[in-house]
């Protein structure tokens, strides 16, 4: 997709949302700058001669990471042989939009997209699931029993939402963001339990939030709590975004209504954010909004009937003196803490799908182990991985995928040509932290764990222009730019 077509999609999105001409002009200015600044190699790539090397490339996973990779391979090879294995019809749906569904800005239909409409021309689709891997013989098996061979394998299967680890939610087991067959409706609808990590659950998040607001309007004192688990998660800012947005929705109704709801964030970690500059600002924003936090709390159980969440709280105590190390031992202590709630937004533990995590291409922690720069498997040279499932220190965001898929494609072609893998992923990731309705802090950073803004503006400031970017520009850029392998 060329830039003119991409800008056309931006215009359609703005018209559909009915924003003012002034804001539309601002947004289009951001869109134009974004296509230039965020995609500096497009022109160079489009002018480069396609490689004549040939190999059978199989991609496991047909979401954003998998389809973007497939599209760029098609664009970069003169004789492409690319197969995508994906069981879902809606794998390319716009997952970042779930947060907006959870606060009534989007409807479910605004984020749902059919894979058939975005499958790159020339890519073969196997509508099934990879269940066994034999990397020593360059093949895998799908659930039908068919064995698929490959010369190169790309693993982009995303993450499973491990609700089953939370007592009280065992019947949900492992589910996925776009899974429409789970039992979430029965468990979440009208119970006060919510999450934006599943699209159907995001719908009930808004219903539960509205019910909480109605009760607060009656003068009732209520408790809203928000969890963050002890595993790596995709979009690490989402648990805070939904909290900011609930605060905004309550304040829309009235400051007195907001005052009736005590809001507390319970993360397992001891930090708000991994980059100090952003963490300092987030803490200050929480204080200004009268939003609380309690570190070192991991959600273990949800009693839906009695509306009680049980957390495991941990802390360290000084133990005995170690004469060899010349320091005191640290003793980890834990206790269970029951927290009553009226509204609970839970972020489920996440893991690699079992069929990958427990396979020879997985690792002790489940994620696919790769060199963090080349994204090549640490054991099998003809396997690459990217996106949420890759074991890299950062990178479980769509913004990371935008950088990673180009690295994977360039390095696969280099490997096919017998050349050194020179493309490097620098750890770039971005989290548009929605701090209110109309304000976003665009948190960009990389391996350095320092802010790395793409635009010459202070990245720690909340800005309306980043709201325009998040609300109106990023979705068409993702759906029509990245999925075509051009952005």
Question: Residue ranges of each PLM-predicted region?
Answer:
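A Rossmann-like FAD-binding core segment of flavoenzymes
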Residues: 79, 120-132, 247-365
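FAD-site-proximal beta/loop scaffold in flavoenzymes
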Residues: 170-218, 328, 337-401
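A conserved FAD-binding loop/helix module that cradles the flavin
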Residues: 389-425
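C-terminal segment of N-terminal export signals and the immediately downstream linker at the start
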Residues: 38-78
């Amino acid at each position: 997709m060329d830039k003119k077509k991409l800008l056309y999609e931006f215009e359609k999105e703005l018209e559909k949302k009915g924003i003012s001409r002034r804001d539309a002009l601002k947004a289009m200015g951001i869109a134009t700058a974004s296509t230039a600044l965020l995609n500096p190699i497009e022109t160079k790539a489009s002018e480069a001669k396609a490689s004549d090397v040939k190999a059978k490339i199989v991609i496991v996973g047909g979401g954003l990471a998998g389809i973007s990779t497939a599209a760029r391979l098609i664009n970069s090879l003169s004789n492409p042989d690319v197969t995508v294995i994906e069981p879902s019809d809606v794998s390319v749906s716009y997952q970042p939009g779930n947060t907006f569904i959870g606060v009534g800005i989007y409807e479910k239909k605004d984020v749902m997209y059919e894979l058939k409409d975005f499958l790159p021309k020339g890519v073969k689709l196997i509508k099934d699931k990879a269940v066994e891997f034999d990397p020593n013989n360059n093949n895998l098996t799908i659930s039908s029993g068919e064995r698929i061979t490959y010369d190169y394998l790309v693993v982009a299967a995303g993450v499973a939402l491990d609700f089953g680890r939370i007592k009280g939610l065992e019947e949900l087991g492992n589910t996925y963001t776009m899974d429409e067959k789970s039992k979430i409706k029965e468990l979440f609808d009208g119970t006060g339990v919510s999450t934006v990590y599943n699209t159907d659950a995001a719908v009930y998040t808004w219903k539960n939030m509205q019910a909480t607001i109605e009760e607060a309007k009656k003068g009732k004192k209520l408790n809203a709590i928000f969890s963050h688990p002890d595993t790596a998660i995709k979009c690490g800012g989402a648990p805070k975004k939904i909290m900011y947005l609930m605060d905004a929705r309550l304040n829309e109704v009235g400051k007195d209504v907001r005052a009736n709801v005590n809001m507390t964030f319970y993360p397992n970690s001891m930090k708000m954010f991994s980059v100090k500059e952003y963490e300092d600002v987030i803490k200050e924003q929480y204080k200004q909004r009268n939003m609380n936090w309690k570190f070192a709390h991991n959600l273990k159980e949800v009693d839906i009937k009695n509306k009680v969440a049980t957390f495991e709280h941990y802390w360290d105590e000084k133990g005995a003196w170690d004469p060899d190390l010349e320091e005191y031992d640290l003793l980890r202590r834990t206790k269970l803490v029951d927290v009553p709630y009226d509204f609970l937004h839970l972020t489920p533990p996440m893991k690699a799908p079992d069929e990958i995590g427990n396979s020879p291409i997985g690792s002790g922690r489940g994620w696919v182990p790769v060199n963090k720069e080349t994204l090549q498997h640490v054991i099998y040279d003809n396997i690459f991985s990217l996106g949420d499932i890759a074991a890299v220190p950062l990178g479980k965001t769509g913004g990371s995928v935008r950088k990673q898929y180009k690295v994977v494609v360039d390095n696969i072609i280099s490997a096919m040509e017998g050349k050194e893998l020179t493309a490097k992923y620098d750890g770039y990731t971005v989290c548009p932290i929605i701090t209110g309705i109309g304000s976003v802090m665009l948190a960009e950073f990389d391996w350095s764990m320092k802010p790395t803004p793409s635009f010459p503006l202070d990245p720690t400031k909340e800005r309306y222009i980043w709201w325009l970017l998040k609300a109106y520009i990023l979705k068409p850029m993702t759906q029509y730019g990245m999925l075509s392998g051009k952005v």
